[in-house]
Amino acid sequence: MTSLPLGVKVEDSAFGKPAGGGSGQAPGAAAATAAAMGTDEEGAKPKVSPSLLPFSVEALMADHRKPGAKESSLAASESAQAAGGLAQPLGVPPGSLGAPDAPSSPRPLGHFSVGGLLKLPEDALVKAESPEKPERTPWMQSPRFSPPPARRLSPPACTLRKHKTNRKPRTPFTTAQLLALERKFRQKQYLSIAERAEFSSSLSLTETQVKIWFQNRRAKAKRLQEAELEKLKMAAKPMLPPAAFGLSFPLGGPAAVAAAAGASLYGASGPFQRAALPVAPVGLYTAHVGYSMYHLT
């Protein structure tokens, strides 16, 4: 309680009054007095060594070097709490502020670690490192949330056109029946009801079978007739020779053409007469001229 007024007096003497005036105390003496008072204040407080703090670097490093570090750290923490009045965290039992164990034993969770702050057990913070099967939560292990197994993609089945279930089987005609039917078809393609009934009874067939056979035979005859007509049309088309497109003669005929060519090429303008080139027979061009004139008209 005496240090506060003395400090105030020092300020008054050091800053409030000019040097060498008033109280008559020198500036050097005032500084010495202030230093002495500060020393008394520091001596009055209990000194706590940094190595005694449980969470200091020196205390943590000393645990790894000294075998009996746990007992010394506990004693140091209790003495530090008693001397300095350190506040203990709420909800923490006394004596739990000790330093961690030696490296030989697993380190307990500190109060400032993730497990200490979240109040989780040590096993919850250690992940399972099993390479065989990853750890799953209970809802993932439930078959309700598990993904369905992969299905193999099978090729789509080939869908064929199905006949009616009530379709009648095909009638197997004998050779004698087929010959009689062909003979009758050549005579008459359309049968009356009476003729069909009589003819079917003679062949031991039903009227429906004879009727369907004649219908199919008429369709086949029509297809054959159309194919024959197409062949005749292809054969009737004229095949023009290549010379018919490159030759063009005047209306005078081949003889006039040959005479005009000889007069223009071998005229009597020169002193020497040359022998005339052999002219092709007229009959060679007659067919071409007539053929081309036929198509031009």
Curated annotation (Swiss-Prot):
Biased composition (Low complexity): 26-38, 71-95
Keywords recorded for this protein, A-Z: Developmental protein, DNA-binding, Homeobox, Isopeptide bond, Nucleus, Repressor, Transcription, Transcription regulation, Ubl conjugation
GO BP annotations, alphabetical order: embryonic morphogenesis; inner ear development; negative regulation of gene expression; negative regulation of odontoblast differentiation; nose development; positive regulation of cell cycle; positive regulation of odontogenesis; regulation of odontogenesis
Comp. bias regions, Basic and acidic residues: 127-136
Gene Ontology CC, one term: nuclear periphery
Region feature (Disordered): 1-50, 63-110, 127-157
Similarity field: Belongs to the Msh homeobox family.
Protein name: Homeobox protein MSX-1
